Amino acid sequence: MNQGTKSILLAATLAAIPWQVYGSIEQSSLLPIPPMGFNNWARFMCDLNETLFTETADAMAANGLRDAGYNRINLDDCWMAYQRSDNGSLQWNTTKFPHGLPWLAQYVKAKGFHFGIYEDSGNMTCGGYPGSYNHEEQDANTFALWGIDYLKLDGCNVYATQGRTLEEEYKQRYGHWHQVLSKMQHPLIFSESAPAYFAGTDNNTDWYTVMDWVPIYGELARHSTDILVYSGAGSAWDSIMNNYNYNTLLARYQRPGYFNDPDFLIPDHPGLTADEKRSHFALWASFSAPLIISAYIPALSKDEIAFLTNEALIAVNQDPLAQQATFASRDNTLDILTRNLANGDRLLTVLNKGNTTVTRDIPVQWLGLTETDCTYTAEDLWDGKTQKISDHIKIELASHATAVFRLGLPQGCSSVVPTGLVFNTASGNCLTAASNSSVAFQSCNGETSQIWQVTLSGVIRPVSQTTQCLAADGNSVKLQACDSTDSDGQNWTYAVTGNLKNAKTDGCLTEGSVQMKSCLYERDGQVFGLPSGVQLS
């Protein structure tokens, strides 16, 4: 089958998928809000044992983490024996876990926690232990018998079988696990690591293809590189920023019942400053990403416990709307992100990526607040202080610090239009409006000309020129007066595949000279990030 035919068939398949249906048993109630808890990997890797987990459960129950919502304790790789039993069942390492995993499950449950486990979709785990390939039903039943309700399924040692591409092989294996879990009386939470094995290449097509199907099969997906482990070489902050940047490319996939997972929180990593640790937590909270701590819990400091149990930020993370914060603006120094919250409030998160303190005024119009003569209440979610703002909010941020504000919208001022960057996810370039009605893709520079409003009817207009609308005519794209007779040319739909399709031309926006071309499946030049809250077609 040639690539063109395959693209057409794949696009047709994606068009037929009911994107509101997610999760292992095709219901969002299995995991309506992101999970919170503990995993040993980034801190201890294979150096795990029974005592580590009992001490962790004891500490989390005593120091406020459990009561703050961190109610899951998950094993990672290296928990098992190197051989299955005579009947093919997995066995735990009896030296590391002398009382056994069923006993450990009972122990952590008695402390108020759920218990999760790790396996691999290949014939071996990443650490060289038995994988679940060809043992899926048996292993799922074993885990349930042991008292486990959460499965992280890795993707090491997966090889394409005859007649399948590697992406198709992963889809078959994770799809089979989805079927197995769906038949269980009490399905396990399904954390999929498949996308991580396709991230970071020169072409994102396979990565996005995997991202298209993981939300249908499970509740969360590890989408990119592992966070730096405690003993690893390199910069922990750079590792956090790497995973943060990957996560910003994927907001269109997230909704209640499915969550993008940029990997663990590492609050006791010695390579991080206090501001960097707090930023890590605040950014993941703003994303409504899983909050899974990988640290030596008994030794966490009071300050680390304090920010990890920040009620206001946890409330944002656990907000039932489950929107992922997206870029309102970005330049080389500041990232400004925003999203809606279920009660109608608006979130503002600002990250200083630079190496010096920055002061900036941020117009409320950049945050999607379009009403004039309104006064909003802005609550600082770090210290609880509030201030009244009207046309802008002033931010002062130290290097690598993150500010988070919750904006209350008074009656009569509650109108919000999804607002922010329209950027190509492969190049990172931002759609930019010019004063001569032309548009171009340029490096993101924090200018108002790169900030766009996207209305419910599919109209896209720059905040710098709100009487002008993005329009397509033939192969060209330009700005023209809104509400003109060419309304179809100003109407756009946004798909989960990242395509921005025009109603008049039936083509898709394409980076380059900013033009319309035939819509292709997950092609780099046609995959765009838009503000959260934009309706998917």
From Swiss-Prot:
Signal peptide: 1-23
InterPro entries recorded: Aldolase_TIM, Glyco_hydro_27, Glyco_hydro_27/36_CS, Glyco_hydro_b, Glycoside_hydrolase_SF, Melibiase_C, Ricin_B-like_lectins, Ricin_B_lectin
Cell division keyword on record: no
Origin superkingdom: Eukaryota
Active site: 154, 212
Residue ranges occupied by any Ricin B-type lectin domain in the UniProt entry: 413-537
Annotated CDD domains: beta-trefoil_Ricin_AglA (cd23425), GH27 (cd14792)
Residues listed as glycosylation sites in the UniProt record: 49, 87, 93, 123, 203, 355, 436, 491
GO cellular component: extracellular region
Enzyme class: hydrolase
GO terms of biological process kind: carbohydrate metabolic process
Reactions catalysed, as given in the entry: Hydrolysis of terminal, non-reducing alpha-D-galactose residues in alpha-D-galactosides, including galactose oligosaccharides, galactomannans and galactolipids
PROSITE patterns registered for this protein in UniProt: ALPHA_GALACTOSIDASE, RICIN_B_LECTIN
Coiled coil segments of this chain: none
One term of GO molecular function: carbohydrate binding
Compartmental location: Secreted
Family: Belongs to the glycosyl hydrolase 27 family.
Cited function: Hydrolyzes a variety of simple alpha-D-galactoside as well as more complex molecules such as oligosaccharides and polysaccharides.
Protein known as: Probable alpha-galactosidase A
Source organism per UniProt: Aspergillus niger (strain ATCC MYA-4892 / CBS 513.88 / FGSC A1513)
